[in-house]
Structures are given as structure tokens and as C-alpha cells.
Amino acid sequence: MFNGRPFPVDAFPKIIRNAIYEVEQHTQAPQGLIAASALGVISLACQNRIDVCRLNNLRGPVSLFLMTLAESGERKSTVDKLLMKPLYQLEEDLFEKYTHDLTAWRNDEAIFNIEKKALMSKLKSDIRRNKDHLATNERLKELLTTNPKAPVRFKFLFNDATPAAIKAHLCGHWRSVGIMSDEAGIIFNGYTLNELPFINKMWDGSIFTVERKNEPEKLIRDARITLSLMVQPNVFKGYIDRKGDMAKGIGFFARCLMCQPASTQGNRKISNPIFSNEHLPVFHQRLMEIVNESIIKINENNRICLRFSAEAERHWIEFYNQVESEMRMIGLLYDFKDYASKMAENMARLAALLHYFSGDGGDISVTAVKAAVEIVAWYIEEYIRLFSKKEEFSLDVSEADELYCWIKDYCTQKFSSCIKKNIILQFGPNKFRNRDKANELIRILISQNKIFISSWGKTKIINITHCVF
């Protein structure tokens, strides 16, 4: 069961779009998979540099939660390595530096503790003997100001960690990480997602209190987490069977941009052995510019707050209102209100990421917002397809098929692959001219991947999937 509508790669800014096409040329992996991987690494790079501000005072993270379902052999690991290559190298280099600095710090700390112990012993002796201890006192004070500071552990990626380990790291000096895996079975079957309320709080950008026995209370403040998981469908189904109700009930899935792109296996033939190699380095350069800037400015703790331009904000509000309208009884998102409630925020985050990563200055542009709308709309269709409860539609399936046949016949007569939704209400069979009935059957056809919905201004367009004339 796959979505016939291609991922809207052309909506991306040039620097991202070209990199995605180049990775596709090298791997022939599904575009949706490559795009999700690119969005994950962009989110990880940018989340420590920027926040997004909506409606003047609603400030929040830009971090994305992405979940991509793909069978074994879809070249998930290859895609991940191509897009993440410089970040993997940087993390390796920084870890090597950290281990060296940690050894030096432990040596300095040992010397410091010896000097501290000696001065404290002398101070106690001076006090006991009623001797002038002012000089010793000053020497001790001066020494205490030179207490060696532990090196910062710059860790970007977690792929098999307990919630306790992630919390411990986020209590430290570097509080921007990604839970990322190209084979996320170990995450879905392990401990990493055992505390989803904590993961949700990190998506929200909330303060989180960590309490441990025999330890002082700690706060996780201003932390950022990107989630980018590629998982095989059968592994995800097992997770759904075990914990799906809880994950959906507390809003974890609602925060995620989820998809299952159509497989390219069986169609990955080599037509041209000469590959482009010019675009990924540009993508990598921008990626590392942002990451290195975050490292350099670690002590400033001051993210840039990106705001929408006036025109961009109008488009964001229009998207918000449209999503809200579709949550009504007759709307396409009526059965998915939990997911719909997070879409405007996810769109704002995505717009901020596209704007900042492309190097555009100033406020978030209307171009970035329009691109974000197109991408988020694709993810909405994917979520509906993945989570539609088909068993509830059994009584209406025959009518849905009947409507589908009528739509196909109409399109064939018009030599088209699409039809305005209002055409059904005006000229369709009488029993389908009721708006509520038509909307219900359209939802069924979307869930069956027979049609998908697009918009032309305020007009809803019904498109037939895989339609050939």
C-alpha cells in the first residue's frame, strides 16, 4: 500500500532540492525517503541556532520528528551516509578531542585536589594554633577560582540509548541532539522510546525536571531533540500492536511527519553510469557552517528567533484556518484531529528550516511558507493513508467503489486525471450529491490510495492515482 503521489521535491529550496536529486541519482532510493533523511539532518543542524515565532509571541523549537517506513533493501543506510557524512566525521573528531581533553582535565583536577587538600590542611592547622591564617585563606580562595572545568561533550546523535542516558546528556552543557537511525528496529524494540511523555516534552521545548534518588534535582531547559527514524513496516506494525494506542493517545504520532514512500525496487536500472557530484558538497558545506556556528557560540545560549514576513504570516494563518475547517464533521481531517492539531506548528517549523538553511536573511519568506505547506500536505495524506481505520468503512466500500468508477468515467470522457470536488455534488449520481456522504466516500478512496486531494486556490481537486489515458 503506497502513495502514488510523488514527494514534492521541487518545493524545496535549490540547495536542498539539488542534493536530494543527486542522492536519488546515486542510490535510486525513493524520493520520499531521501527527503525525510534530508529534513532530519537539516532539523538537527538548525535546531540549536534558531527558533520560530508565530503570531508575535508564540515562540517554539524548529525540531522535527520524522518517521519513514521502508522495506529492507530500500538503501536507507546508503542515503543516510551520503547526507550525514560530514556530521558523522565531525562527531568522530570531536569525540577524539573530548577523550584527550578529558584525560588532561582529570590530571588537572587531581593536581587541583591535592593543592586544595594541602591548603585546607594548612588553614585548619593555622586556625588550631591561633596563627595568622589570612595569607593561607587568600591562597585557598585564589586556588578555588581555578577549579578545572570539565570539557564539553559535543554529542549529536543517539541511536540506541536509554531515556536516562539522553536525559543525563541534556542536563549537561550541550543540549541539542538527534535520535536518528536508518534501521530503527533497535529503537522501536528497545528502551529509547519507553518514555514518550519525555520525548513529547522535548518536541514542545518544555522544561523537564529530572529527579533521582540520592541526587540533587536537575532541570533540562532549552533542550532540542530531532527524531529521524527509518524502520521496516513489519517492525513498526509490531510496535503499533504493543504500544500504538498509547503512542497515539498521548500525541506522539501526531507530532511526527510519517510516510511510507513507494518502493523503487525492481526499477533501479542504470541508464547513465556518469553521476553528478557537485551538489552534495554544497549541501554539506551549509550544514557544517550551521553546526560549527552552534559549537562556537555555545556559551551565548541565544537562538535567533525567526518571524514571518507579513505576507508569509497571512499564508500561515490561511493554512491554519484551512486545517481547522477540515477538522469539522464533514472535513477530510475529521478522523485525524489529533494529527491536524499539530500541522500548523509543523508547517511553521518547516518553513523556518527551509528559510534559514537556504541562507536567506530577514523574516521567513512567503516562498518558504508555500514550500512548507506543499510538503506538510503530502505528509498529511500519508498519515491519513497509514492510519485510516478501514474496518469502519466496510458498509460503504461498495458505494466508494461506485463513486470511484463514476469519477474515472468522468475523467476519461474529459481526457483528464482530475476532477473538481464540486462536480460530484453538482453532476454526480444523486445519492452522492449529499456533501456529508460524498466526503465520507472520498475519505475511503483516499485511504485506499485510489485518489488524492490537491487545491487550486480554494477549489478542491480530486486526482486519480496512477491514472493513464
Swiss-Prot record:
Pfam families found in the cross-reference section: DUF3987
Family matches, as InterPro entries: DUF3987
Gene Ontology CC: one annotated term: cytosol
Miscellaneous comment in the UniProt entry for this protein: Part of the CP4-57 prophage.
Protein name per the record: Protein YfjI
Name of the gene this protein is made from: yfjI
